[in-house]
């Protein structure tokens, strides 16, 4: 199909926006971008014209840390469920995602799911690969985990995991644990991003193979004026930082601190969403724990957050209420993550030749329509 989206408020990249622009789609790709809708006369008869009447157009969102949605989780999803997850993500504007395998899995469970997901690519939202949140995590920062499944880093185990899959893109590790540096180097050498999280690490524990921090502030030591914790390190602007911006995992005033002081190119919005996302309020089981969903909170019976129940789009609304610009929201929700994984030449901005993964929204960021690989999905 060939579409011409006109009278659109185009958020192009982290610096540019066109208030009355136009964007042409030919097949899977963006075929042209116009700074003003009055520039389209020469090509208008070749496309199906769609008047957006000033609505926002942004690149599709990339959620690099999510565990599932609507009772379906990556820890045990088969290919049919993966298609359903892919569709529900697309409806929320998440056109690309990593499947996060949780620390509730044994090594044997990891093996099985790595094998299951090896040849999956995403029927709707794109499946870009796997994030292993475990098993090499600190028992001091369990989250909702089972301490028996938190293991010491084991290079042979990682090598065995890598024999099962070519799709591993990221692993979360507690970098202070003995053997972590050897695992980190191996992963780095195999183009897998190394994230430090569920960790008691401080600055001295890190090395050149660490790429960033998993869900900043959560499951790590807090900011300190003498100990250089991972939170302190985040403000050095040397590492990428996952940020859950639901207003619960990180207080809104602390979110302001982050966006005002951490380099805008280093922040990656993630949901860390649970299988209770998109469900009604009530009681659910997640990662072998009984949890309660109430509004935007999902909490175990002993008071711990068990992941979120929001979308990237929901988090963008929170940040917009804090005064974040549309161009910065593009960075946080899309481009930074694509750049982190080396995919930014194909995704993450509205530029000629890139994939037409688009989210159409009103000025309050309510999603109206989606395009995935140039295919229209009505919300």
Predicted regions and their residues:
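Divalent metal-dependent hydrolysis catalytic cores, especially in the metallo-beta-lactamase
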Residues: 66-67, 83-110, 125-138, 165-176, ...
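N-terminal metal-binding scaffold of metallo-dependent hydrolase/deaminase domains
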Residues: 1-42
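Alpha-helical scaffold segments that flank or form the walls of functional sites
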Residues: 55-57, 64, 74-126, 149-164, ...
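His/Asp/Glu-enriched, well-ordered alpha-helical/loop segment
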Residues: 232-241, 260-271, 277-361
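Active-site core of metal-dependent hydrolases
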Residues: 159, 163-280
